Swiss-Prot record:
PANTHER family, alphabetized: PEROXIDE STRESS RESISTANCE PROTEIN YAAA (PTHR30283:SF4), PEROXIDE STRESS RESPONSE PROTEIN YAAA (PTHR30283)
Pfam families (UniProt xref): H2O2_YaaD (PF03883)
One GO term describing the cellular component: cytosol
Taxonomic path: Bacteria, Pseudomonadati, Pseudomonadota, Alphaproteobacteria, Rickettsiales
Organism for this UniProt entry: Rickettsia felis (strain ATCC VR-1525 / URRWXCal2) (Rickettsia azadi)
A GO biological-process term: response to hydroperoxide
Name used for this protein in its record: UPF0246 protein RF_0769
Length: 248
């Protein structure tokens, strides 16, 4: 089983992770291609295409300009935000981290797909950003889908578990994916209606990755046995390809 999650805008490069050795990212040449485009933009252009403040545009202009000399950190330690905070990566053992290294991919606008211990540098590039007519979803789709197929070919349980947002999971081409895609949904029962509450769903995605790591889970079936921040599996609302977890 291979799990995908979205990268985060929030980064934490202040504290370094000392318990792991960094690995090399999967698509360095394609990352460099995007970097060349990003380095050609002025601060005003970055502010416009990324829809960010001039202050953030200045920070990212400086990052891209001197990218190779920026500090590196393992991806799973470098990202912050609701998903990553609930993985509780700082509490994972080396054995659990090594398990995630072969069972988790972090989807990124700049790096495409990252193994948890792949080295990354500080950056900002959301998957929905357009660079000189480059659609990042299209740019990455074939490469990432082919890579996932190759990885799952070596797995005993050949499932792709989708814990990424719509914007990021769209880099997987379902028509070219050779194996079963399983989507995860976290919903809340509010006055008899099932709704997805974005921030709570993000936290639950992180909690599920934590459970996968703690229990070395390699099958979607086993995920049904655990609660995730109050969300519990609902057989009534689920199918083989859509697993629904509900908080009452």
């Amino acid at each position: 089983m291979l799990v995908i999650i979205s990268s985060a805008k929030t980064l934490n490069f202040e504290k370094l992770a000392l318990k792991t050795e960094l690995t090399t990212s999967i698509f360095p040449n394609l990352t460099n291609q995007l970097l060349s485009t990003l380095q050609s933009y002025s601060e005003n252009q970055l502010s416009e295409i990324m829809n960010i403040s001039t202050k953030l545009a200045h920070i990212n202009k400086e990052r891209f300009k001197d990218f190779n000399n920026q500090e590196s950190k393992a991806a799973i330690f470098a990202y912050a935000g609701d998903v990553f905070n609930n993985i509780h990566v700082e509490k994972l053992t080396n054995h659990e981290l090594n398990f995630l290294q072969s069972h988790l991919l972090i989807i990124s606008g700049l790096y495409g797909a990252l193994k948890p211990l792949d080295a990354i540098k500080p950056y900002r590039l959301e998957m929905t950003t357009k660079l000189n007519e480059i659609n990042l979803t299209s740019f990455w789709q074939d490469e990432i889908t082919d890579y996932i197929n190759k990885v799952l070919a070596k797995h005993e349980n050949k499932y792709l578990l989708n814990l990424a947002s719509q914007e990021y999971s769209s880099v997987v081409n379902p028509n070219k994916l050779k194996y079963q895609l399983v989507n995860i949904h976290f919903k809340e029962n509010r006055d008899g209606k099932l709704s997805t509450i974005g921030i709570n769903a993000k936290k639950a995605r992180g909690a599920m990755v934590n459970v996968i790591a703690n229990n070395l889970i390699d099958s979607p079936e086993l995920l049904k046995n655990f609660p995730y921040l109050g969300y519990e599996f609902s057989p009534k609302h689920s199918s083989d390809s859509e697993l629904v977890f509900i908080k009452e």
